[in-house]
C-alpha cells in the first residue's frame, strides 16, 4: 500500500468519466502487457500494478455499495445505515451534537396526533410535501382536501411548499423565514436602510426605486435550481449612474451599478401568507400551534 502512495500527485483530470470494474480490468491488462514485454520495467512499477490489481476493483465495489446506501444523503451511520447524521440541539454546555438520527414529522389536531412520518433528511422544509403525500396515500385524497388549512412554523416556509399547498387547495398558515422579524417593532431600525427589503417596488411598472429616487428597471429573467431540485424563476433589476451617486458608499460598494433580484412567485406567496397570519384567524392559529 505504501508503494501506491509514493507517487507524485496526479495532474487534474481534463474530464471525469464513470469508472467501472470492466474499465479497470481492461486498463490493468494493457499495463500488464506493456510491463511484461519490457525487460527494463522497474520493480516499483510492477509493485504498483500489483497494488492496483489487489485493491482497485475491490475498493470500487465497496464505494458503489456505500453510494447506494447513501442515496441522496450526505452521510449515514455505520451502525444504523438508514440513519443520517444530524445536528442535535445544544446540550447543557451549549455544544451542538452531531449524531445519527431521524427527522420525525407529526401532524396534530387539538393536541391529538393524526399522522406521523419518519425522514432521513434533517431539513424540515423538505419533509412537508412527502409527509402530506403519505397522509394522502394513507387516508385518501378526500380526507386531505377536508383539512382545508395547514399551520406550520417558518421551517416549512419555502416556495416549493407554498406551490404544493396551493396546488392541493390547502390554505397555508405557514410562516416564511423573516415573518417573525417583520413583526419586531425595531425590525426596520435594525435592518439596513439601503437593503433590498426597504426599497420600494412598483408593481404596475415592475421596477424598484433606489434611495435616490431613480428607477431600477428589469434587465432579464433567469432560472435557479434549489438544493432540493426545485426550479425558481428570478427577475433581475439594475440601477443607473451609481458611480456619481452621493449615497453610493452607503447603498452599494461593489463596482458598476447596483443589481438586485426578485422572486415574483415567492413574493406573491409571502404577501398572501402575511395577510393570513396577521388576520384574526391567523393569530388564533399561531397561538393554537404553540399549544399543539
Predicted regions and their residues:
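Anion-binding and metal-coordination hotspots
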Residues: 1-292
